[in-house]
Amino acid sequence: MKYLRSLMQQFVTACKNQAKLIQQFTLSLLYLLIIHIVALLFFFLFRLVLFTSIDYQFPPDIQNNFLMQATAFIKGLWFDNVIACYILLLPLVILWITALCNYHSKWVFRFISIFFILFYSLSFIISAANIPYFSYFFKTINSSIYNWFGYGATTAGMVLGETSFYFPIFLGLISILLLSGSVLRLSSYFYHLINSKSTSISPINRLCIFATG
């Protein structure tokens, strides 16, 4: 009877701790969601700059068709969201595991920050390079760009010698800097916020929490 009572008390405590863990994981999801939205805003900016830079090349029926232009931006948002979701997958799994284990170390948030900065920087570089590339070839960057790697000096001369490329380069660099600063600030803020709500959970209670979902 005492054993059953003790087990019930542990189960009740586990349910209370589960609510705290859910709150912590909700904050982790909010942290990832904000970074996701910020990244989508930058992707939208790149698409807007690309659209305005090549608007003169469109036929009149497309230039005056707002519905078609809006549909194109929505499809672009869908594509950008797919890319951002792929980037988001690993941090989401990591934060789910750390929330389940009630382990919220600074190095975890630091790793996630570096991960986001690296992959979004690569994405922004491609998005920025796509602006002059599309202006020249009227198609987005694809695997054919690797053909230019064999002419490094020539390619560098074309990029640095063309003044119209300066703005996309500047846009890419400033986007990387702004996103990096935002990610680092958000990581620091949510790290302290989540740890302020942390609680001590015994292994038995943790098993009960895992069993109850």
Q: Language-model features: where?
A:
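N-terminal-proximal low-complexity accessory segments that begin disordered
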Residues: 33, 37-50
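N-terminal helix-rich structural modules
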Residues: 78-97, 107-119, 123
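Alpha-helical transmembrane segments and their helix-start/interface "positive-inside/aromatic belt" motifs
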Residues: 23-38, 107-118
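Cytosolic-side transmembrane helix boundary signature
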Residues: 101-102, 174-210
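Hydrophobic cores of alpha-helical transmembrane segments in multi-pass inner/ER membrane proteins
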Residues: 83-95, 170-185
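Membrane-interfacial interhelical loops
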Residues: 46-79, 112-172, 193
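Residue-level signature of transmembrane alpha-helical entry/exit and packing/kink sites
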Residues: 27-35, 168-169, 202, 206-210
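Membrane-interfacial, low-structure loops and terminal tails that flank and connect transmembrane helices
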Residues: 2-29, 107, 189-204
